Amino acid sequence: MGDTGFYRRRFRIRIVRSLNGTVEFFRKASRDLLFNVSQPLSSGVEKIVQNIGKVRNQGVEIDLNYQVLKSKDWKLSVGANATFINNKVTRLPDANRKDGIIKDSKKLMEGHSIYEFWLRQWWGVNPDNGDGLYIFDAENNTDANGNIKDAVKKTLVEKDGQVLTNSYSYAKYDFSGSAVPKVYGGFNINLSYKAFDLSTVFSYSLGGKVLDSSYRGLMDVGEFGYAMSPDLHNAWTTPGQITDVPRLDNNSDHATSIGQSYSTRWLTNANYLNLRTVTLAYNLPKSILNVINIKSARVNVSAENLFMLKARQGLNPQANYAGVSYNEYMPAKNFTIGLNVSF
């Protein structure tokens, strides 16, 4: 991979005496990135690694600090940072410029992010019979005269003026959002009263998408002997029932179509708010330190990853920058007691 250009410019700002920070603009263009590129069946290999294309990353980073309160006994300050980034493919080889390059759940296409999902378009559950329905791909499932094959017609149904199919084989693919968040960053709160200090650090992300492959596996009724999600209790059972979980049966084609196929059904927002650290500390007073002949002593209790607000229980949206979550562990909760002494 080579860089064709890198630009970074930082500005320091001070709005009022107690509010200051920095604003930094950046832009980086890269070429000859490594990607797995699908090959024709006649080649004898499924994919090969190639140096292809150009990608541009640009955005702005903002870092602000504000002294809210400062008195003899009390001090309160807050800080926050935010990064806004835009990722875009600016050039592909001539042979791939029209149709792009499909790479697992993504599609490389000029004008789109390398982390933008390319997935079957899930519509929902047919309330009449519990079938899982996809938006029908008419463009690739008709002949030159615009006629649909009889085998395909049997899978079709019309809902709300839209032609749908109960087979993932005839589902329409489309761009479905990016794993790159609109904004991400963190903020902190620091409070002190006399000898006590309390500090917290949060991290957050807004606007990205994540393909929850772990949840897909838990909802797959075609797999026997595996753990299953309690959401399967919401499966369709009665005509007219409105639900987002298709009916459960032992038809292998039905199970494959609704469970094993990757689609926007398994795509969810990757927004999160994580309380990363909380620390409470006490600084021993001079009256005690002088007696035991110590310069300073500080006792602290801290906790990490106390909670995370997110779209779905068990999902860890920050585990994978590419936006695919599969058997990822949640951040472990850690508790620490510390003593710092200076002689």
What do these predicted ranges mean?
Residues S38-P40, G44, N57, R97, ...:
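Short capping/connector residues at structural and topological boundaries
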Residues S176-D212:
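Glycine-rich, aromatic-lined ligand/substrate-binding cores of catalytic
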Residues S205-A297, A303:
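Extracytoplasmic gating/loop element in the C-terminal half of outer-membrane beta-barrel translocons
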Residues P40-K47, I101-K106, I114, W118-W122, ...:
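Surface-exposed, low-complexity loop segments enriched in small/polar and acidic residues
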Residues M1-I114, I258, Y262-F343:
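Extracellular/periplasmic, surface-exposed regions of secreted and cell-surface proteins
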Residues I52, R56, K98-F117, G177-G186, ...:
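C-terminal extracellular loops and terminal segments
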